[in-house]
């Protein structure tokens, strides 16, 4: 019976792959090998961010610098941050994840987050992961929130609960990438609300 169930599962996966083939998160080509999430030829293209990096925000720094200039000059409302890849090596991929309907990319990136940043995340001792929400109008257009997909892909693998309803975006803000530093800070003021829920903070 178990062999039959396994066979049915493999058949189902094969049918899904044929009808909805997985796309490589780098080149966006169809991944031909079953069970793989990225093309063999693209495996080395996403460049992992290597030290030295800022001890506060994770931004790349010069040799011998503990903190980047921004973190030396400004107080931030977070303890620590880390980046996984060099920006230029995944910029087009992340754009397709956010705006091109390639939600399956999140599974690959969630897996990579756990593999390379899992120890860092566990050392922080998080009680939960809270993805930044999209405004309901933007989510309706996009069909999903890429931050939530990434959070679930990583959180499920690490057995960390993901609270996607803890925050609500109450103001449809302008895209951050179009703004300068001061405008970005003002853009997010009063943009979020914490509704009544059963989650204990």
Predicted regions and their residues:
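Glycine-rich phosphate/pyrophosphate-handling loop used in enzymes and phosphotransfer proteins
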Residues: 1-201
């Amino acid at each position: 019976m178990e062999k039959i169930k396994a066979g049915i599962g493999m058949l189902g996966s094969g049918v899904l792959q044929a009808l909805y083939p997985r796309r490589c998160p780098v080149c966006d080509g169809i991944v031909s090998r079953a069970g793989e999430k990225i093309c063999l030829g693209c495996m080395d293209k996403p460049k992992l961010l290597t030290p030295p990096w800022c001890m506060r925000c994770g931004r790349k720094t010069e040799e011998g610098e503990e903190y980047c200039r921004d973190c030396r000059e400004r107080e931030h409302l977070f303890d620590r941050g880390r980046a996984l890849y060099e920006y230029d090596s995944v910029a087009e991929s992340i754009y397709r994840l956010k705006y091109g309907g390639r939600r399956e990319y999140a599974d690959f990136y969630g897996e990579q987050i756990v593999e390379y940043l899992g120890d860092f995340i566990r050392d922080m001792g998080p009680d939960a992961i809270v993805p930044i929400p999209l405004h309901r109008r933007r989510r309706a257009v996009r069909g999903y929130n890429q931050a939530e997909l990434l959070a679930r892909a990583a959180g499920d693998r690490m057995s960390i609960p993901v609270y996607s309803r803890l925050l609500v975006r109450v103001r449809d803000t302008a895209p951050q990438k179009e703004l300068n530093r001061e405008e970005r800070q003002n853009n997010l003021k009063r943009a979020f609300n914490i509704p009544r829920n059963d989650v204990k903070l």
